[in-house]
Amino acid sequence: MEKGVYIIGTNTDIGKTFISGLILKKLREEGRNAGYYKAVLSGAIKEKNGLIPLDCEEVMKISGLKESYENMVSYILENPYSPHLASEVEEVSISMEKIKKDYKSVRDKYDFILCEGSGGIVCPISFSEKKLMLEDIIKEFNLQIILVSNSGLGTINYTVLTVSYLRNLGLKVKGIILNKFNKSDIIHRDNKKIIKELTGVNNISTVPKIEDIEKYDLNELNEVLYGI
C-alpha cells in the first residue's frame, strides 16, 4: 500500500472535506509531511482571477497546509454536478494520465497523501469519452479507504452497503468516521455498535458537531488512524 489514505463518503455533502482537513491537521501537527490531493473538484466559485476550489480552501484553512491549487487538484470545474456531467457541460476532457502524473508530483513532495474523493464510491469521473470511475483512481493509487458517514438514522444501511460494495471491488477499508456524532444520542451510539458488528471494521472514530476547531481534541481520530 502507498503511504496515504483515500477519504470517501457514503454520499455527497457528508463532511468529507471537513474531516479531511481535521486528519491533515492532526498529521501535520504530529510533524508528518502530509499533503492533500483531489483528482476532480466540481462546484468551484468563479472569481475575477479564475475558479476557486472551495474544498481546497477549507482543507488549507483547517490544516494549515499552504499549497497552490494546481498542486492539489487536477481538474477544477465550476458547475456543482457530478464530475462526469460538469466536465461534459464545460467541455473538459478528463485524462487518467494527467491524474496519475499530478498525483505522482504530490507524492514526490509529501511523505503522506490524503486524497479526497468526489461524492460516494459510485461516482463517474468521465463517461462520454472514456469511462472512468472513482474506484479506478483509488485502485491506481493503491490506497486504503477511510469512509465518512453520517451518525443519524439511516446510516447503518448506507454505511454497511458502501463497505460491502468497496470490498466487492477489492478495496480495503481502513476505518470509518461517524460525523456529527452526539454521545448522548442513543441512536448514534447504537449505530456505531451495529456498524462495527455488521461490517467487521473495528477502527471507527466519531467526530461531534464542531463549533471551534481549536477546542476539538484531535486524539479522537486516533482509532481510525491507528497504524498510519
From Swiss-Prot:
Record pathway: Cofactor biosynthesis; biotin biosynthesis; biotin from 7,8-diaminononanoate: step 1/2
InterPro entries: DTB_synth_BioD (IPR004472), P-loop_NTPase (IPR027417)
Any single GO CC term annotated in Swiss-Prot or TrEMBL for this entry: cytosol
Keyword line: ATP-binding, Biotin biosynthesis, Cytoplasm, Ligase, Magnesium, Metal-binding, Nucleotide-binding
UniProt binding sites for substrate: S42
Major localization listed first in the record, in broad terms: cytoplasm
Keyword Metal-binding: yes
EC number: 6.3.3.3
Reaction equations catalysed: (7R,8S)-7,8-diammoniononanoate + CO2 + ATP = (4R,5S)-dethiobiotin + ADP + phosphate + 3 H(+)
UniProt cofactor(s): Mg(2+)
Gene3D superfamilies named in the record: P-loop containing nucleotide triphosphate hydrolases
Residues forming coiled coils: none
Subcellular location per the Swiss-Prot or TrEMBL entry: Cytoplasm
Residues the entry annotates as binding Mg(2+): T17, D55, E116
Active-site feature positions: K38
Annotated family: Belongs to the dethiobiotin synthetase family.
Known function: Catalyzes a mechanistically unusual reaction, the ATP-dependent insertion of CO2 between the N7 and N8 nitrogen atoms of 7,8-diaminopelargonic acid (DAPA, also called 7,8-diammoniononanoate) to form a ureido ring.
Subunit structure: Homodimer.
PANTHER family referenced in this protein's UniProt entry, alphabetically: ATP-DEPENDENT DETHIOBIOTIN SYNTHETASE BIOD 2, DETHIOBIOTIN SYNTHETASE
Name of protein: ATP-dependent dethiobiotin synthetase BioD
Record gene name: bioD
